[in-house]
């Protein structure tokens, strides 16, 4: 998937000036307009391929579907709650964020919240401003020796752990992705959730808002917690069930909470905010000069690197694309798309299961990015729903009635060589199998249904190819085919054949353009098809 035609970027929220400068220095045109209504945003996006936002702009399905040229949405920050990911993915719009840009600021705010909870600093400050001097009311607790439960051990969770360990806190945590060994390497004991609840004096959450994390702290889990537990949420509103938290505060099960985020922002229900044991901020996790500068810089660099084909980072809705930018993988992406296009032309809108098989050590983990490229080739001509690309391929293939499986086999000795890297695309239960490889940076077709091409056939983007199977002993076949090309006004640019397989030979002709019809050809050969990717 190329982004070379991405030329104009709209920045619709306030960002550090470095963002605009980096984009412009990278050759991109930039428009900055803030506080746009939905209608105004749609109007501005009509001639923009890229959009960069913070949290204020709502990139809804209506906006995405109405922005015909939109290719990429960049979120200068971590959370993408304000972007409709499903709509973006369906439209084939890439969504990126800056996962590390505000990590330090969010971690520092979390640590500040923990200290404020322990010593009731905001409440004591408010009391002093009211002219009071009440030392007994604000009795606190030391952090030293207390147990901190960290739910989510990504960058922010790790930074929090390091800082609070310096206060003498014991850190335990939970993360379904991070292994116990990795967690132990930064001083966190990984435990199942049911063991964390009764163990912790303080709990802080640092997970994304997902169906599996919504209401992670609820009536049931609060009941399992140590009485007097204190809770911090500087991640996403909704991870802590706000109703359950209020009930736990009212009963004394929870001694205090520090909230930087809410299910609804700003919160209309003031019960939590007004509770005397709640510290709250208006979503300030990334509100530092350093974080804003870092996020603006990172998202701009990501856009420029993407357009120049250097790298792709921070991808939210198509992680497989990240591999597509490596020099080794790029030509294999082209091969996969070519074989998918070939399979569609050959099998005629196939149904059932498409098998994508990689072979060779260097392709061991490549299936995740090659299978979407195969799908692009399969569906590009058939799909009437949207432009098929590496972002939406897996979503659209299911709707097309196809199942795509990916597997890997090691390189084996044989005619292809020892350990040679190959890509096979086949239709399960049907006589359609194509095998390709990459020579240098050029995708090559090596085999069709066991018929080997020596040398291999170059598969070049934009080069029409006609493939047909016929008996090798027919002396008039080739002159007849050339005559049919002449009648259609199509030039023959290249020609080669496979070895004989099952009594037939595959012939491949490079053409100046695709033929308007293959009906005349099919009268003279066993089968024929043409394609161009």
UniProtKB/Swiss-Prot annotation:
Phosphoserine found at: 14
Keywords: Acetylation, Amino-acid biosynthesis, Isopeptide bond, NAD, Oxidoreductase, Phosphoprotein, Serine biosynthesis, Ubl conjugation
InterPro entries from the UniProt entry: ASB_dom_sf, D-isomer_2_OHA_DH_cat_dom, D-isomer_DH_CS, D-isomer_DH_CS1, D-isomer_DH_NAD-bd, NAD(P)-bd_dom_sf, PGDH, PGDH_ASB_dom
GO biological process: G1 to G0 transition; gamma-aminobutyric acid metabolic process; glial cell development; glutamine metabolic process; glycine metabolic process; L-serine biosynthetic process; L-serine metabolic process; neural tube development
Pathway, per record: Amino-acid biosynthesis; L-serine biosynthesis; L-serine from 3-phospho-D-glycerate: step 1/3
Residues recorded with modification N-acetylalanine: 2
Position(s), cross-link Glycyl lysine isopeptide (Lys-Gly) (interchain with G-Cter in SUMO2): 21
E.C. numbers: 1.1.1.95
Active site: 236, 265, 283
Residues where NAD(+) binds: 78, 155-156, 175, 207, 234-236, 260, 283-286
GO molecular function terms attached to this record: NAD binding; phosphoglycerate dehydrogenase activity
Top-level class of the enzyme under EC nomenclature: oxidoreductase
Residue numbers carrying Phosphothreonine: 78
Glycyl lysine isopeptide (Lys-Gly) (interchain with G-Cter in SUMO1) crosslink location in chain: 21
Job description of the protein: Catalyzes the reversible oxidation of 3-phospho-D-glycerate to 3-phosphonooxypyruvate, the first step of the phosphorylated L-serine biosynthesis pathway. Does not catalyze the reversible oxidation of 2-hydroxyglutarate to 2-oxoglutarate and the reversible oxidation of (S)-malate to oxaloacetate.
Family: Belongs to the D-isomer specific 2-hydroxyacid dehydrogenase family.
NCBIfam families: PGDH
Subunit relationships: Homotetramer.
Protein name (database record): D-3-phosphoglycerate dehydrogenase
Gene source species: Rattus norvegicus
Lineage: Eukaryota, Metazoa, Chordata, Craniata, Vertebrata
